[in-house]
Amino acid sequence: MPEQFGQYGRHRFWEMIPGILTWGTFLLAIGTSLFIPWVAVIYIIIFDLYWVLRVLYFLIHVSAAYRKYRNTLKVNWMDEVKKIADWRCVYHVVLLPTYGESLEIIHEALHAVANSTYPNDRFIVVVGGEEGDEENFENYRLMLEKDFEGTFKHLMFTMHPKGIPGEMQGKGSNLKWMAGKVHEYIDAEEIPYEDILVDAFDVDTIAHEQYFAKLAHLFLTEDKPLRSSYQPLTLFSNNIWTATAPVRISSFGTTFWLLGELVRPERMWTFSSHSMPWQMLVDVGYHEPDLVSEDSRIFMQGFLHYEGDYRVTPVYLPVHMDAVEGETFWASLKALYKQQRRWAWGVEHLPYMIAEFRKHPKIPKRLKRRFLFNHLEGMYTWTTAPILIFMLGYLPFFVAGDTTSALIANAPFSLERMMQVATIGVFASGLMSFFFLPPRPKGVKKWNWGIMILQWAL
């Protein structure tokens, strides 16, 4: 069993690396700008060129993934599943951890499962509450039991206790508790582990009606299906029409990032709501209960347990979720910042991979290098690129002032041209976002279409 790393400080040096790289880059950019600006200019040109190439590379993959997405939407996957012998052996265990959500949100998630094209008698649905939210949980539990009585093969409710040693209160620890409880039911029903898929969803997840059928089809046709997690396309579209413009831009950005990753499964981790084999979840001892980003860690747990023989298979169908919201514009921005900070919490995974990879000599070194580089490069550019390009990029020219250096004199024009090329990504994202928009709700005015267009000026 891999060591749990949620209790920070055990591997302090490796925990410091993301911060050292980020702040070291900023200090280096400021220092060279003040004392040797021509060096800073060269660095900025190289970095901007790298960013432009990355944008173009990103657009190629997003375009390819979008075509696959559109083609997948055209297929009736339940009809395809029925062509496979013994397809009814596949069960879905849907895990919905909750904390403080309204009855409406949970009801919509269950309703989406009930209205999927996959047979309801092949669903085991688990709604997990927290002891700290017990009163709210018990109130909606009675209503949900009444509304969905007899709908699924089994609907169960669990209550995750507070204060379990080694845990932090969060989605991961609740998922671990829920898995343990449904494990007892699965054993009692004598359902073979290899016939079960687990859908670990955020509670606001509205799965596409064909998602579970498509997933079952993949599970029945993929090579070594028990050695793969399954990643859908995440659309933060449930409330996209009422979210603030910065939140909408960020939400679409996350969707396009994941869309580009789907066509490169060799570098993928799982993200947010996704699915996995029950056998894998049991083999690794469920989700780790003491960290923030359990959604991606569970993939690495499987990768380590199976000595690198574990992957992510893309599912080119969407699951719809809520974009972050607040009562005011600034509250929404604060919630967005906290969400992005949680996703970018690279200090959890880097020390974990470095320490665990050393314990697994059977994993090919090329795979270890790939995951380490992709993770570190992704976290690094995420934190540094916006500030380097749009803020510190101007500093060396301001310090240099009027100069006879041809490099410094001509660099702004070169950088301007590169940024103009990079804006292709913005225009492409803006155009593509309209294909992912849900129908305009009745309470939203028509002029909001104009805001949907103008927001990309941000």
Q: Each PLM stretch: what is its role?
A:
Residues 26-55, 375-458:
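Membrane-embedded multi-pass helical conduit in multi-pass membrane proteins
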